[in-house]
UniProtKB/Swiss-Prot annotation:
Function: Catalyzes the specific phosphorylation of 1,6-anhydro-N-acetylmuramic acid (anhMurNAc) with the simultaneous cleavage of the 1,6-anhydro ring, generating MurNAc-6-P. Is required for the utilization of anhMurNAc either imported from the medium or derived from its own cell wall murein, and thus plays a role in cell wall recycling.
Reactions it catalyzes: 1,6-anhydro-N-acetyl-beta-muramate + ATP + H2O = N-acetyl-D-muramate 6-phosphate + ADP + H(+)
InterPro entries found in the cross-reference section: Anhydro_N_Ac-Mur_kinase, ATPase_NBD
Binding site for ATP: 18-25
Family: Belongs to the anhydro-N-acetylmuramic acid kinase family.
UniProt pathway annotation: Amino-sugar metabolism; 1,6-anhydro-N-acetylmuramate degradation; Cell wall biogenesis; peptidoglycan recycling
Protein name: Anhydro-N-acetylmuramic acid kinase
Domain of life: Bacteria
Keyword ATP-binding: yes
Amino acid sequence: MSAVPTHEAEPYVGLMSGTSLDGIDAVLAEIGTGNQVRLLRTRYIHYPDDLRAQLLALHTPQADEVHLAALAANALARLYAEAVGALLEGIDPAKIRAIGCHGQTLRHRPGDGYTIQIGNASLLAELAGIAVVSDFRSRDIAAGGQGAPLVPAFHARVLAHPEIHRVIANVGGIANITDLPPNGPIRGWDTGPGNMLMDAWIHRHQGSRYDRDGSWAAEGSVAAGLLQALLRHPYLEQRPPKSAGREQFNLESLDTTLAGLGQRLEPGTVQATLLEFTAVSLCDAVTQECRGAQELYVCGGGAHNGALMRRIAALLPHVRVTTTADLGIDPDWVEALAFAWLARQTMHGEAGNLPAVTGACGERILGAIHPA
């Protein structure tokens, strides 16, 4: 598809459903050249319990998983279309340039040369009546990159400052950071777990989807032995560029670590330690790799975890720690905005990756276009 020659701002939809498996973030944004991004509307739709259970099960190899994944992809497409319909109520879909749909990650294995995000973008295009850009990560992996993180390109375009050394921390299921020095290379990588382990642990023991404000974790004490065992995870020893997912951080590996300690810990103690694990792994990355950082802006679900935000601030005493709300973007919508922006890059024939971030051999136009 040829690039669109106009430089005027255009409306795009961004859809994000991340590794937390909680639901769909949907945004409508007006996007132009440079750093022109204006958030117009937002919607959030929870995953139904049965769909969430299906998606969780698909993270583990099982019989007939290709068929089951295809059925889940169709269900996701219908839910995405529902989100788009709610988002665009009263707006003619023909006025929307494109939807940027991340899809739901089932496997992310750049070392094996592939990544899988499902969502049946063709069905979504059919139901929504809008062109859909999807499968953003595969082209970067084909070019030798990690395929992740991709949001640093958006952070660099929209959130960088010419004189202040900023770091953007996206704390979703996995935590990633973007290093934005005013005079230096832009880098970004996954630092380790974000909310994923905490969410899984509280769901197992209390049936909740997440630990609201980190209140359960705040009641417990950190188990030093468990924390040190978690911090010995091989992923944390790797240097960037690197990316992570459920393959590295999951309940099964946590159970193995707990069994290896030879002592029984109270569930609240484990939750407190998991929060500390997220905070320490993120802050160690900032301290070691983002020297001279002055400001850290948190987005994603972790921005609402007061206990986690306090620990990050305590571990980075010389850095101003706050959320992207202080930059004019609600922390809940940064990732969905990024995929609306990535769709714009693709529709205009412009690169969406940063090779210094992903390790790709060059800039690439990302994604596959599914016409309306």
